[in-house]
């Protein structure tokens, strides 16, 4: 939420409009683009108070909605953990119509599962629950390796699609990744 607020305030300082589309497997909430501090505060309030009704994630649904909503070329920031599939076409279309910036949110447990003993893990996307013995070193190493492969493949795929991708970790400051992104953009233009 904080990084979205920073980006929104930065945009209004630049005189730009800011909007919000919150989604799960459906579009949950839309705040149409407007200018002004009061509008950004409304967006922040919506981010804090949203109660999602959907169970999964459909990036395609959200991007298709954004493409219908925005008539003019805009900067679109997609903040997600990208635990979805089948979104390439929607991202490509959005990237062609707009300036798409993917903000990949990653949790420390996705980097390294801690030794916490027996865990009951619930996947809200698939509605599945599994028991995992996190004190098993081989299992932790295997899971860590698979997650690293998945993240590396995603990052390479974004490069292949020529899309901007900012990786932000929930347990670390977002300042460095944002600054690095803006410096790369400045050197490009």
Kindly label every feature range from the protein language model.
Residues 1, 55-59, 147:
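A conditional alpha-helix N-cap/helix-loop micro-motif detector
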Residues 1-33, 65, 75-78, 84-85, ...:
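An amphipathic, basic-hydrophobic helix/alpha-beta surface used to engage anionic
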Residues 15-18, 34-36, 61-62, 126-128, ...:
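Short hydrophobic/aromatic-rich motifs at helix boundaries and adjacent loops
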Residues 23-41, 45-49:
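RNase H catalytic domain
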Residues 34, 53, 141, 145:
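Charge-dense, low-complexity intrinsically disordered segments
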Residues 39-74, 86, 107:
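Von Willebrand factor
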Residues 65-75, 84-189:
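Von Willebrand factor type A / integrin I
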């Amino acid at each position: 939420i904080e990084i979205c607020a920073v980006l929104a305030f930065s945009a209004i300082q630049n005189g730009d409009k800011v909007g919000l589309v919150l989604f799960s497997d459906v579009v949950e909430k839309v705040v149409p683009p407007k200018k002004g501090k009061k509008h950004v505060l409304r967006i922040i309030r919506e981010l804090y108070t949203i109660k999602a009704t959907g169970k999964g994630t459909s990036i395609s649904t959200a991007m298709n909605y954004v493409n219908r909503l925005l008539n003019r070329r805009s900067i679109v920031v997609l903040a997600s953990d990208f635990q979805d599939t089948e979104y390439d076409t929607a991202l490509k279309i959005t990237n062609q119509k707009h300036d798409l910036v993917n903000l990949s949110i990653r949790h420390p447990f996705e980097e390294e599962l801690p030794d916490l003993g027996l865990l009951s893990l619930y996947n809200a996307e698939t509605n599945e629950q599994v028991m995992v013995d996190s004190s098993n070193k081989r299992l932790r190493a295997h899971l860590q390796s698979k997650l690293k492969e998945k993240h590396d493949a995603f990052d390479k795929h974004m490069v292949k699609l020529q899309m901007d991708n900012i990786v932000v970790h929930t347990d670390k400051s977002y300042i460095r990744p944002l600054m690095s992104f803006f410096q790369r953009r400045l050197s490009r233009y």
